[in-house]
């Protein structure tokens, strides 16, 4: 099954943001970005740490790179080919996920259920067994306030917040992106009642009203898989 990524601004707006302008997320790493020594990605009880002993450890997730004491001042980088790479301070490679794919935009996301997943073409994920979490039905994935995973739903006045941007599914049925230099909306103000936004397993964003009538869609349907907005 594909693990695909929808980038919020490029996917919805067709805008391009310089990589240098994109700050490191608290629970994700974009291609070209680096997690420095003692850096963290966090999501709920899960904490991915690039330790000062050069070991990459997912706490409460029962996973590690097994590279303790293999280098100093190590850094984790996600390449433009979807490969996670740990490098020593001299630039030598200590560990890599060996999941190299086609060149493109990727995101390594610390999933709410404790998986570290690279979204893009299907490339790399670890599947730790965490009692009480791995047994959850997919629809019960804990909500993350800056990411939407298929098939999660954003209800009226619900929002996704990333740095100075907010994507809001307003109570008036309009989907609006606030913040930054650019703004955007679905132009569906007043077109329905009790509307909600859903990301389906084909990567399509859909606004429906309380009668499940489709008010708006991104028309970006792709192959069946797991997606993240």
UniProtKB/Swiss-Prot annotation:
Q: Which cysteines are joined by disulfide bonds?
A: 54-74, 173-195
Q: Where is this motif: Carbohydrate-binding motif 1?
A: 51-59
Q: Where is this motif: Carbohydrate-binding motif 2?
A: 170-178
Q: Where is the signal peptide?
A: 1-23
- Role this protein plays: Mannose-specific lectin. Shows agglutinating activity towards erythrocytes from rabbit.
Q: Which GO terms describe its biological process?
A: response to other organism
Keyword Ribosomal protein appears in the UniProt entry: no
Taxonomic superkingdom? Eukaryota
Q: What is this protein called?
A: Mannose-specific lectin TAR1
**Gene3D superfamilies (UniProt xref):** Bulb-type lectin domain
- A GO CC term attached to the entry: extracellular region
Show the coiled coil region(s). none
Q: What is its main location?
A: secreted
Organism (species): Colocasia esculenta
List the Gene Ontology MF annotations in alphabetical order.
D-mannose binding
Query: Which residues are noted in the entry as beta-D-mannose-binding?
Result: 51-55, 59, 63-64, 170-174, 178, 182-185
Q: Which SUPFAM superfamilies match?
A: alpha-D-mannose-specific plant lectins (SSF51110)
The answer to keyword Signal applying to this record is yes
